[in-house]
From Swiss-Prot:
GO terms for molecular function: 23S rRNA (guanine(2445)-N(2))-methyltransferase activity; RNA binding; rRNA (guanine-N7-)-methyltransferase activity. It comes from Legionella pneumophila subsp. pneumophila (strain Philadelphia 1 / ATCC 33152 / DSM 7513). It is found in: Cytoplasm. Residues 44-155 form the THUMP domain. It catalyses: guanosine(2445) in 23S rRNA + S-adenosyl-L-methionine = N(2)-methylguanosine(2445) in 23S rRNA + S-adenosyl-L-homocysteine + H(+); guanosine(2069) in 23S rRNA + S-adenosyl-L-methionine = N(2)-methylguanosine(2069) in 23S rRNA + S-adenosyl-L-homocysteine + H(+). It is an enzyme of class 2 (transferase). CDD domains: AdoMet_MTases, THUMP_AdoMetMT. Its EC number is 2.1.1.173, 2.1.1.264. NCBIfam families: PRK11783.1. This is Ribosomal RNA large subunit methyltransferase K/L. PROSITE patterns: THUMP (PS51165), UPF0020 (PS01261).
Length: 707
């Protein structure tokens, strides 16, 4: 007896799935978007469940019929002989897709189908199946389209990509059947038969390596689980199923090839090993913690297959270009004689590889359209992103400007014991970046391009920027960090954009300071305020210093090293802990300093403490939920300054600073206090090209203005 089936798959795998299913004995009747229709005997059905590496679900089509209204759907489901599929003591769940004029809600549609099944069994023997939406023994699919209802039974009960070996995954997991599709497109079964090795340099939780091992060792993916819904099917033949399982186990063969997965993250490597152990292939594979630039082939020929990170937004894509350039260089330099298959969603990143692809295949990683680039790594496939590749005329102008800035600012920075400074700030308008040096790292902040600039132009400039910066500044591509700077609103300025927690120690005069170049848009150190911080390094010992909106308290570190007693107030616990770490790094005794987590406005209203020097550097705007009110510095600066002046000793000094470019100081403040605009004195050499980076004022009581 033959059964009608629909086997679903991820978008883009339809014809690859068709070939696989034909090889397993399915008589294919139609290929449709995201699936294949066909007919099969019971042994073939069992083999599909055991051996398909590409399928999502295997659905046994039960019946179809015309149905536009609720009553028609119910009648079709009541009339069907459900006892030929399962008995009343089984648990069920319904997945409903589609709609009609009357049935517009999938939950409502599922309810009608369920009621029809229940009514059928009640009419048959007075009993009914129970519903279990979480883990049903019988999963029924109902699809209503063009007034035709099609109902099917999910023979396995879950998507076949859920092999059972992956309990946890990495940050961007690749579905097992998509990984299998990558390997099939790359001709891995044929290459493995010829003795080729395999290496995934971005292995993550090990999916590609594990799937490759299962293919090469002829391990049926359906063997790993024994909780298929088949066992609850009324027509299930357990003896035949066990016979085919045994045959599948007997087909497993020893491996004569080497399969290696590497990743820079040691924790994810531990996870990959655990997954491989659950898959039963741990003795067949090797997982090591290794950075990309340390990867080397262990054999003369093999397949490099990987799913490197790829961003969906322009800023993310740009940041990944150096990684892809390094991947291309590594492949070309070290893996001659090998094949490669690289999956990415970005043509820009594919181009950054610098290598010519023999073939491209469209695959979908979840909803994201990707391309699998298959390459032959040989001397004939010349690398186009070599360090000495010629620059365009515009890129050469950028190179010249960066080289000029570097020659000037490096000497100045060395002389002043500074290891972090701005080297470029959109000097050439067509390359709208700010570039900051932190030791031997470069942070590139891309100003968001106007909507009028086509995406391809913006991407071209980004690629040229990333081509030029390492050459002109002598920075290793791995030490380029790219961010996209845009006008920030409210709490966005302090929100995380990553979670690497990688810290770097930089030097500024006598102070050592902690920066984080990856996790936030800002790094923990505002470079433009350097001269203000160095001013505080000249304070007299015992000076009572208040740093309001202190951020990571880098200004207070300078003051404390001079012997001042500091009070540091900020709403963020994260930054206050960072501030304390800055103090510890400089061997400053924390017991002489205060770190207070408060809304600065509220704290200044209530405190009775007095200070000799106050540094007030609030954000331009903040609407943090933890604040009592929205902060708008143009609107609120008068009240903030008045509150700060109340906390000064009679001969004290307030330094007020803001990065709001269009800031205008309220004239009445000059009538009440002695106010001096000291902005020019606070702009250091590296910010001379952008003198409006901030505004800074020295404010004292009038009778101390001349002191």
């Amino acid at each position: 007896m033959n059964y009608s089936l629909f086997i679903s798959c991820s978008k883009g795998l339809e014809y690859l799935l068709e070939d696989e299913l034909k090889g397993l004995g399915l008589h294919v009747t139609q290929v449709s978007p995201q699936g294949v229709y066909g007919e099969a005997s019971l042994p073939v059905i069992y083999n599909l469940c055991l051996w398909s590496r590409l399928a999502n679900r295997i659905q046994l089509i039960l019946f179809s019929g015309h149905a536009t209204k609720e009553q028609a759907v119910h009648q079709l489901c009541t009339d069907f002989h459900w006892q030929t599929v399962f008995t009343h003591d089984k648990t069920i769940a319904i997945e409903f897709h589609g709609a009609s004029e009357q049935i517009r809600n999938t939950m409502f549609g599922a309810q009608i189908v369920k009621d029809g099944i229940v009514d059928h069994f009640r009419r048959l023997n007075g009993s009914r199946p129970s519903v279990d939406k979480e883990k049903p023994q019988i999963l029924i699919h109902a699809h209503l389209k063009n007034d035709i209802l099609t109902v099917s039974f999910d023979l396995v009960g879950y998507s076949l990509h859920q092999r059972g070996y992956r309990k946890k995954a990495g940050k961007a997991p690749l579905k097992e059947n998509v990984a299998a599709a990558m390997l099939l497109r790359a001709k891995w079964p044929e290459l493995a038969a010829q003795g080729y090795s395999l290496h995934d340099p971005f292995c993550g939780s090990g999916t590609l390596v594990i799937e490759a091992a299962m293919m090469a060792a002829h391990i049926a993916p359906g063997l790993l689980r024994q909780d298929q819904s088949l066992q609850y099917w009324a027509r299930h033949q357990s003896s035949l199923w066990e016979k085919l399982r045994t045959q599948a186990l007997q087909q497993v063969k020893p491996l004569a090839v080497k399969l290696i997965g590497t990743d820079a993250d040691s924790k994810i490597i531990t996870l990959a090993r655990s997954n491989a152990e659950r898959a039963g292939v741990l003795p067949l594979v090797e997982f090591n913690t290794l950075s990309l630039n340390a990867c080397r082939p262990g054999t003369k020929r093999g397949l490099v297959v990987c799913n490197p990170p790829y961003g969906e937004r322009l800023g993310e894509v740009t940041q990944l270009v150096p990684l892809y350039q390094e991947l291309g260089t590594t492949l070309h330099t070290c893996y001659q004689g090998w094949q490669a298959a690289i999956l990415t969603s970005s043509p820009v990143l594919a181009k950054a590889l610098g290598l010519r692809a023999d073939k491209q295949y469209t695959l979908y990683n979840g909803p994201l359209e990707c391309k699998l680039y298959c390459l032959t790594l040989s001397a004939a496939n010349k690398l186009k992103n070599t360090p000495n590749a010629p620059l365009s005329d515009n890129a050469q102008m950028l190179f010249n400007r960066l080289e000029k800035n570097r020659n000037h600012l490096q000497k100045w920075a060395r002389k002043n014991q500074i290891t972090c400074y701005r080297i470029y700030d959109a000097d050439l308008p067509e390359y709208a970046y700010a570039i900051d040096i932190y030791n031997d790292y470069a942070v590139l902040q891309e100003y968001a391009p106007p909507a009028s600039i086509p995406v391809h132009k913006a991407e071209k400039r980004s690629l040229e920027m990333l081509q030029v910066v390492p050459r002109a500044l002598g920075i290793h591509p791995e030490k380029l960090i790219v961010k996209q700077r845009k006008q920030q609103k409210g709490s966005e300025q302090y929100q995380k954009i990553g979670k690497t927690s990688q810290r770097l120690i930089v030097t500024e005069g006598k102070a050592k300071l902690i920066v984080n170049l990856y996790d936030y848009l800002d790094t923990g150190l505002f470079l433009d305020h350097r001269l203000m911080r160095l001013k505080f390094a000249q304070l007299e010992p015992g000076t009572r210093f208040l740093n309001c909106f202190c951020y990571t308290a880098s200004a207070s570190v300078h003051a404390a090293l001079a012997g001042a007693l500091t009070t540091n107030v900020d709403l963020s616990k994260t930054y206050l802990l960072w501030a304390e770490d800055n103090f510890r790094l400089n061997d400053i005794n924390l017991s002489k300093h205060q770190f207070l987590q408060y809304d600065c406005k509220e704290w200044m209203k209530t405190t009775r403490d007095k200070f000799d020097v106050i540094f007030l550097d609030p954000p331009s705007f903040s609407n943090s939920k933890r604040m009592s009110d929205i902060l708008d510095i143009q609107r609120d600066h008068v009240s903030l300054i008045n509150m700060a002046m109340r906390l000064l000793n009679p001969d004290g000094v307030l330094y007020f600073s803001t990065n709001l470019r269009q800031f205008k100081l309220e004239p009445m403040l000059k009538e009440k206090y002695a106010v001096q605009d000291i902005t020019p004195q606070t702009i250091d050499q590296d910010f001379k090209r952008n003198s409006k980076i901030h505004h800074c004022f020295k404010i004292v009581m009038p009778h101390f203005a001349d002191n």
